[in-house]
UniProtKB/Swiss-Prot annotation:
The gene is Acot2. The modification N6-acetyllysine is found at residue 83. One of its GO terms (biological process) is acyl-CoA metabolic process. It catalyses: hexadecanoyl-CoA + H2O = hexadecanoate + CoA + H(+); tetradecanoyl-CoA + H2O = tetradecanoate + CoA + H(+); octadecanoyl-CoA + H2O = octadecanoate + CoA + H(+); eicosanoyl-CoA + H2O = eicosanoate + CoA + H(+). This is Acyl-coenzyme A thioesterase 2, mitochondrial.
Length: 453
């Protein structure tokens, strides 16, 4: 009987589907044994749509079919980053009366998350290696997300009923990746597939240095020419950042503005953390910047001097006695920077800027006081007759507001501090913030920079 069933399946269209999106196993139908239900043979399939592959910021539709009515199951997800670090999540579910389970309709009953969370198996992933942040280092290869369906509600003990592997890409089909070595500028430019010119954006990350491309590559798939810009600890750039010379960033701005596939007259800036601070300084000192999105950035120079021509902004003072220790043994440094209202020379002169700003703020950011900084920037701009910036605050969101579905990085090594610190955030609230922030910044840039010519 089993052999003949396999023969039927081999001849069916089900067995012709991509193995990366469909998997099936025989398991027994439910049997009643003295009032207890045990699960016998079923033909479970796990489907993931879009089929086979998708971009990282795309939502997925995950469903299981062929289960027994109301069968309890556990869904598990896993991926490894380029350094071999494992990230995993799991959630307990129960099939409906028809033996189906659709994550868009079925709430998780517990595990890494609970409730109706269709993308929880991604954003709720946690690293096996403590304090490890999920970063995509090579955007030319996908993350492989492994999904499994297990019988019962034990995340490690149930029989595997079905499995699938789904590719999560960071380059939309046709997006062009162009390494940039022009003068001193070290960067990578991402261009949409079709002919331009396109609205241009410079993308800046934080104090970790190097060249991170994954946000720029995803954003290029939305119709922007995006240049991921390195500014230290990459290639032949300086290995440390005692002084941030705005002339380097000016060279990058001029390069992007003059590119034949970039629409003028001005460009946009996107920066997070230290990158947000630098974006604010660029908008204050440099010409040709029409719009800037600052994600949890500082209004003051932090950890190093900012310099442009004959002008310098010294770093804000450190208040070492304000560093706290959490119950988990992490440093909490949110109170460890002097207020720029006290260290006034460290305040970036935003009043000089004619840039239109959007500030995206995690209200549980423990890296520094992002909400306070955004409010003070708004006050200063308005006091000098400038346009009031848009500020969007996200309750319980932490410091690293990434593109959608990246897991929360709530703690980790801070290179300027030289120790592990808490970055704040609650996983579900942070995931909600990331989805909204991603849409908000795209809408903002399209409005301020326009679409392609």
């Amino acid at each position: 009987m089993v052999a003949s069933s396999f023969a039927v399946l081999r001849a069916s269209r089900l067995c012709q589907q991509d193995w990366k999106s469909w998997a099936r196993l025989f398991v027994p139908p439910p049997l009643s044994t003295g009032g207890r239900t045990t699960w016998a043979r079923t033909n479970a399939t796990l489907s993931v749509e879009p089929e086979g592959r998708s971009c990282w910021d795309e939502p997925l539709s995950i469903a299981v079919r062929g289960l027994a009515p109301e069968q309890p199951v556990t869904l598990r997800s896993a991926l490894r980053d380029e350094k071999g670090a494992l990230f995993r999540a799991h959630a307990r579910y129960r099939a409906d009366a028809g033996g189906e389970l659709n994550l868009a309709r079925a709430p998780a009953l517990g595990g890494s998350f609970s409730g109706l969370e269709p993308m929880g198996l991604l954003w709720a992933m946690e690293p096996e290696r403590p304090l490890w942040r999920l970063i995509k280092r090579d955007v030319q290869t996908p993350f492989l997300v492994e999904l499994e369906v297990l019988d019962g509600h034990e995340p490690d003990g149930g029989q595997r009923l079905a499995q699938a592997v789904h590719e999560r890409h960071f380059l939309a089909p046709g997006v062009r990746r162009v390494p940039v070595r022009e003068g001193r500028v070290r960067a990578t430019l991402f261009l949409p597939p079709e002919p331009g010119p396109f609205p241009g954006i410079i993308d800046l990350f934080g104090v970790g240095g190097g060249l991170l491309e994954y946000r720029a590559s995803l954003l290029a798939g939305k119709g922007f020419a995006v240049m991921a810009l390195a500014y230290y600890n990459y290639d032949d750039l300086p290995k440390s950042i005692e002084t941030m010379h705005m002339e380097y960033f000016e060279e990058a701005v001029n390069y992007l503005r003059s590119h034949p596939e970039v629409k003028g007259p001005g460009i946009g800036l996107l920066g997070i953390s230290k990158g947000g601070e630098l974006g604010l300084a660029m908008a204050s000192f440099l010409k040709g910047i029409t719009a800037a999105v600052v994600i949890n950035g500082s209004v003051a120079a932090v950890g190093n001097t900012i310099s442009y021509k004959d002008e310098t902004i010294p770093p804000v003072s450190l208040l070492r006695n304000q560093v706290k220790m959490t119950k988990d043994g992490l440093l909490d440094v949110v109170e460890a920077l002097q207020s720029p209202l006290v260290d006034k020379k460290s305040f970036i002169p935003v009043e000089r800027s004619d840039t239109t700003f959007l500030f995206l703020v995690g209200q549980d950011d423990h890296n520094w006081k992002s909400e306070f900084y955004a409010d003070e920037i708004s006050k200063r701009l308005q006091a000098h007759g400038k346009e009031k910036p848009q500020i969007i605050c996200y309750p319980a969101a932490g410091h690293y507001i990434e593109p959608p579905y990246f897991p929360l990085c709530s703690a980790g090594m801070h290179l300027l501090v030289g120790a592990n610190i808490t970055f704040g955030g609650e996983p579900r609230a942070h995931a909600v913030a990331q989805v909204d922030a991603w849409q908000q910044l795209q809408t903002f840039f399209h409005k301020q920079l326009g679409s392609k010519s």
